[in-house]
Structure formats: C-alpha cells, structure tokens
C-alpha cells in the first residue's frame, strides 16, 4: 500500500484526497519511483478544475513533476536501475499517470536521470517551464540561429527558460518585464 493523491470531482484543492492504494509493479516501458519531492504547476491545478487540455477520468490521479529514486523497473525500462536518482518529465497524460504519491509509475520516455548536484526539490521542479518554452519557441515558432525574439514576462519561470532556449539555438532574446526589481 502507498499513499496516493486522487480526486473524485472537479474543484479546488479541497477535492484532493490522500488515499491508500495497492501499487502494482511497473508495467512494460515503465519505471516505478519512490517519490522524495513534488513540483507544483499550473497545469495540475487546471486539470483538477477541469480547465486543462484533457478532462480528468474519475477517480483521477494528478501530478506531472516528481523526483525520487527508482524502486523497480518494468520490462523495456533499459537505462534505469533500482536506486537511480530520477525526475519525471511532464510528457504523459495525467489520465494514465499521476506522480502525487509515495510510490508511482511513469513511462520510461518521461523519466530522466538527474545530477547529484540538484536537491530533490530542484530536480522535481525544473521541467515544466522548459517544455512550455520549447514547445512555443521550437515546435511552434520554429526558432533558429540568427532569429530575434521578444520575451514578455521574461522574469517568470517560462520566460527565464525561453531566454536560455533562445541563447542555446543562437537566437537573440529581448527580455521584457514589468518592474526593474524583477531583473
């Protein structure tokens, strides 16, 4: 048995319940993680409120970002072994996976090793802003070396990630923010 956060109706944080559930071993292409830290993000609160790109199937699990140690590896989970320090990457449906819990499974394509220099909290919270920025700049805008772009809200987590992504591809970011104190 493990503690898992689920919800049974759309709503605010009060609909979240900590429940004891039997956790099956990881399936094909899955890694099971003993969670040490969680990241909280807007997508999860939107999912809980029924405002996300997909609607929850009840009872619903929740959570995109977590860090912990590998507890078990399912068939096809090459590259991971029990005890590895890993983070989940928000690249899965919360209707199939949710990482708010003590012991969770995630698809192997959405699990990454992380360096020992990161705390569990840092490792659990580094992905969402980069995936958001990458999707907008690379997948949609097709940003390339030599391009110039304006980044509004550049001091936000996504804005900071967008600056780094632009620099990485050789583009020139122009950063905007509301106040000088947010430099």
Language model: regions and residue ranges:
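Short N-terminal binding/cap micro-motifs at the start of the first secondary-structure element
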Residues: 11-18, 42-43
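Cytochrome P450 core scaffold surrounding the K-helix E-X-X-R motif
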Residues: 43-49
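Glycine/charged-rich beta-loop-alpha catalytic/anionic-binding loops adjacent to active sites
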Residues: 110-120, 146-148
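Glycine-rich beta-strand-centered segment in the early N-terminal region that forms part
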Residues: 22-40, 51-92
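Mid-domain Rossmann-like dinucleotide-binding core that forms the NAD(H)/NADP(H) cofactor-binding site
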Residues: 124-183
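A structural motif shared across PLP-dependent enzymes of the aminotransferase-like
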Residues: 94-108
């Amino acid at each position: 048995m493990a503690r898992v956060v689920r919800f049974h109706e759309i709503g605010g944080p009060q609909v979240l319940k900590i429940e004891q559930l039997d956790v099956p071993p990881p399936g094909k292409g899955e890694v099971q993680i003993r969670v040490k830290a969680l990241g909280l993000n807007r997508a999860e609160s939107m999912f809980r409120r029924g405002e996300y790109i997909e609607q929850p199937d009840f009872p619903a699990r929740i959570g995109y970002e977590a860090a912990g140690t590998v507890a078990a590896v399912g068939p096809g989970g090459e590259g991971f072994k029990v005890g590895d320090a890993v983070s989940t990457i928000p690249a899965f449906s919360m209707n199939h996976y949710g990482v708010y819990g003590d012991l969770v499974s995630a698809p192997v394509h959405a699990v990454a090793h992380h360096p020992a220099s990161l705390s569990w909290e840092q490792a659990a919270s580094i992905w969402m802003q980069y995936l958001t920025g990458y999707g907008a700049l690379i997948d949609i805008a097709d940003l390339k070396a030599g391009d110039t772009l304006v980044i509004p809200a550049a001091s936000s987590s996504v804005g900071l990630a967008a600056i780094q992504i632009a620099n990485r591809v050789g583009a020139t970011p122009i950063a905007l923010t509301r106040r000088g104190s947010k430099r």
